[in-house]
């Protein structure tokens, strides 16, 4: 099974994304299953993980409205009001009717509190996620996010955490050593996973190629191993610096150069197992 472990849907005419600015012109519009399907077919991608794009209920409802009718969407990473444990529990009970619910994400980098994820109310909700066997995805952007992720991993050993986009390695800068040290600290916790995704949009040049990705991919494989790494296109965000074909083909080439014997795991098997894409629903996971 080949899995694109990180993609989005949105219709900005229907749901306004707070982070969308004039600089995002190429992706300001409608990006739904019919647009993505040909690219998935061209690369023989069997399943995707659909990920939230905004911190509110309407975005999550919109995702499920689409995902429930699309066979190749294998899992959904939803949004829950983690800062309100009571409402979080109620909302989770509502969303449990959707068989593809597997994970939760909050855009922590948009919060004014730099350590929002460590607030007592949020921690109470994270305990609920662990109890409910939901994955927590983290859009790690700043050094503090790495440190908070490592602390959460130690505090909730039963909670599976996923670092999106490898924590945005500063490709081509003199801060790569700092990034490597931070992500290795997170990877030392066996309940932390990562996605090799979104790397092309961390590069300012339009003429990026596979050589720009090699160092980040090599470090990721060395510290996580292939059984805790996944690959994602980050479509349509990726369109800001490359089309789907270029992004996916370059990721595959990087994996085949660095770890050809592990490419199958990273390109699908790890995501299949972590998100339990073969299970009929989250409620069935772990049933004896």
Which residue ranges define each predicted feature?
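Mid-to-C-terminal alpha-helical segments outside catalytic/metal-binding sites
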Residues: 1-3, 26-47, 219, 223-230, ...
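Divalent metal-dependent hydrolysis catalytic cores, especially in the metallo-beta-lactamase
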Residues: 21-29, 34-57, 73-81, 102-106, ...
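Catalytic pocket-lining loop regions of alpha/beta-barrel enzymes
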Residues: 116-230, 284-288
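Alpha-helical scaffolding within the catalytic cores
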Residues: 31-36, 58-61, 87-90, 146-147, ...
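Active-site gating/metal-coordination segments in enzymes
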Residues: 58-151, 195-199, 206-207
């Amino acid at each position: 099974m080949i899995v694109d472990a990180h993609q989005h849907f949105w219709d900005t005419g229907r749901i306004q994304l707070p982070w969308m600015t004039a600089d995002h012109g190429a992706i300001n519009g409608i990006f739904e299953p019919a647009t993505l399907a040909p690219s998935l077919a061209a690369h023989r991608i069997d399943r995707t993980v659909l990920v939230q794009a905004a911190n509110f209920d309407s975005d999550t409802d919109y995702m499920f409205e689409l995902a429930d009718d699309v066979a190749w969407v294998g899992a959904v990473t939803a949004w829950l009001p983690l800062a309100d444990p009571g409402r979080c529990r109620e909302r989770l009970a509502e969303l449990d009717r959707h068989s593809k619910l597997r994970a939760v994400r909050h855009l922590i980098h948009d919060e004014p509190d730099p350590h929002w994820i460590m607030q007592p109310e949020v921690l109470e909700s994270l305990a609920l996620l662990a109890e409910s066997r939901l994955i927590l995805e983290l859009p790690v952007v700043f050094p503090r996010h790495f440190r908070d992720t490592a602390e959460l991993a130690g505090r909730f050993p039963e909670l599976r955490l996923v670092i999106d986009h490898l924590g945005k390695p500063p490709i081509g800068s003199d801060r790569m050593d700092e990034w490597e040290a931070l992500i290795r600290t997170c990877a030392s916790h066996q309940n932390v996973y990562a996605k090799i995704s979104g790397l092309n949009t961390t590069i300012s040049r339009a003429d990026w190629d596979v050589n720009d990705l090699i160092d980040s991919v090599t470090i990721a494989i060395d510290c996580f191993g292939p059984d805790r790494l996944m690959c994602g296109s980050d479509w349509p965000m990726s369109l800001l610096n490359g089309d789907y074909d270029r992004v996916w083909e370059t990721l595959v080439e990087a994996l085949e150069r660095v770890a050809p014997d592990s490419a199958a795991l990273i390109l699908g098997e790890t995501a299949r197992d972590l998100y339990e894409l073969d299970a009929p629903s989250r409620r069935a996971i772990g049933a004896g």
